[in-house]
Amino acid sequence: MSDEGRLDKETGLLQSHRHFWNNSPGTVLRRTQLTGNSDPLRVHIYDENIKGEFTPEMLDLEKLIDDIKHAYQGHSLLNGDTFQSIPLAPVVPWMEAIIGCHLYSLGRGASMVANPADIEPGDLAQHLRHLLDNLSENVWFKKLGDGYQALAEVLGAKFPLTHTLMRGPGDMVGALLGHENLVGRMLKPADNKDFLNELLDLCAKIYIKVAKMQLERTKEFKEGYCNWWGLWAPGLNVRTQEDEAAFVSPKLYNEFLLPYHIQEADAFDYSAFHMHSGYVRLIYNWRDFSKKSNISAFEVALDPSGPAVEDLMETLLEINSEKPLIIDATTDEQDKAIKKHFGDFPGSVLYTEPSSAQGLLSFKQQET
């Protein structure tokens, strides 16, 4: 493609992405899920079978940036109807690490988990308040910022950079307390409501600061920012999530989690909230979320063991009647079913096709 043709294509994408955020009927964008090779640290953990506690000193930023540079060498700027955005080491549970949890690498599991911090529950609020006021001194926060600074210098002129995978306030508090402990406390609100709300509020505020720091380090791309899916927007543009929703009832979700999703979404110009298909019909209260916040779009990740696409269609269409919708498929069966319904969606849709890549390194980039 000539330089002129490439520029025309990129300009056309910017306009298509504006249509997406406006939920314009008939806007169907498509992209393909990259393989695990696009996350070199995940590949390294797998190849070297790295197991056990993972500390900041073990993350060699110089090597990581060089590995990311080589992973994207020869990649096109475009991924279907989106831009190829690049996050920094999404295998790392960054938010959990920043708030003081212990990280553990799972070797052939090609992932990491976070275990509770060595902090008494009664001291957690003070710990988080101090952290919020002194984030720049946190070793993981500095590691993340330095990583994005270096990545911007190496690839920022070629690709848009996007913030890394960041889990939600409930996920963060669950990691601090232990997930069973968190839910148990939710079930006894008389004793725990104020305590939990303070922790959730502080974690939401920390999320906002960490996300904004990354966007500042990545700098603008075509006078805007790209999110996790390569969707451009003319303003601060983030992805939010809350996998802790899998452990709670609709009542607990509304009482404890939804207010802080609203707080996060309202802190940015554009935001898309990630939901799992197994819980989108009953737990995630996207209706109230949509009414009470500035949330820009919703994403539904079609879990391999979740409901069939046909069983979800009524919900997907209802969501799309309110907001732009992002759909991520993981199987060929889901892919065929979604494509059959492209003409049924009332608003704008971004569809991520499953990768056809095979082999040990074709594990899907985790978005949980």
Where would I find each of the regions flagged by the language model?
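A contiguous, low-structure linker/loop signature
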Residues: A89-H127
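Active-site loop segments of alpha/beta catalytic cores
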Residues: M1-E53, E57, A71, H75, ...
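N-terminal entry elements of small recognition
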Residues: L128-L132
